[in-house]
Amino acid sequence: MSKFSLKLGSKTLKKNISKKTKKKNSLQKANLFDWDDAETASLSHKPQSKIKIQSIDKFDLDEESSSKKKLVIKLSENADTKKNDAPLVEYVTEKEYNEVPVEEFGDALLRGMGWESDSEQDSKGDKTQSRNKDVSNVSQIHPDGLGIGAKLNKAINVEEASFMPVVKIDKITGTKVDDDKKNKS
């Protein structure tokens, strides 16, 4: 049996550790992914229904008065089982899947991405004309290099009005140097 001490303020708390707790610690440090080890196979994976807490009052730090209060928090079975038993995803039946037409799904996707179509032409029955019109505008709305929702920056297409050419000046003489004269000499 080994001892350890914990100093809180001016009082010291001494605790004895038995061999049983050492075995628990060795089980906790064991590799859970090593199935050859017999100790890890004996670990149970049941959900905890109780959490035990030992409370030590500041007045009970002496060894003589070893009255530790045991607090037990019981988890409600209803809340615990409801969380584990409830399905996470509701599945769509084949009947519900077949009820949604693909055309409406695609239009909904485009509307979600900010695509605006002429609702007046769609209601008249000229769907083919409006779709052809929308497809022809794709190259204007989405130039190369931009994503679906990206907006074209107007400053990119504007050419600068002023042009300043690069002039080479000889450091020694301080005169302008033409490329033709420098290459000939």
UniProtKB/Swiss-Prot annotation:
The keyword Signal does not apply. The keyword Cytoplasm applies. It is found in: Cytoplasm; Nucleus. Involved in pre-mRNA splicing; specifically in the final stages of spliceosome maturation. Promotes the first step of splicing. One of its GO terms (biological process) is mRNA splicing, via spliceosome. It comes from the Eukaryota. One of its GO terms (molecular function) is ATPase activator activity. This is Pre-mRNA-splicing factor SPP2. It comes from Saccharomyces cerevisiae (strain ATCC 204508 / S288c). Belongs to the CWC complex (or CEF1-associated complex), a spliceosome sub-complex reminiscent of a late-stage spliceosome composed of the U2, U5 and U6 snRNAs and at least BUD13, BUD31, BRR2, CDC40, CEF1, CLF1, CUS1, CWC2, CWC15, CWC21, CWC22, CWC23, CWC24, CWC25, CWC27, ECM2, HSH155, IST3, ISY1, LEA1, MSL1, NTC20, PRP8, PRP9, PRP11, PRP19, PRP21, PRP22, PRP45, PRP46, SLU7, SMB1, SMD1, SMD2, SMD3, SMX2, SMX3, SNT309, SNU114, SPP2, SYF1, SYF2, RSE1 and YJU2. Interacts with PRP2. Residues 112-143 are annotated as: Disordered. Residues 100-149 form the G-patch domain. The gene is SPP2.
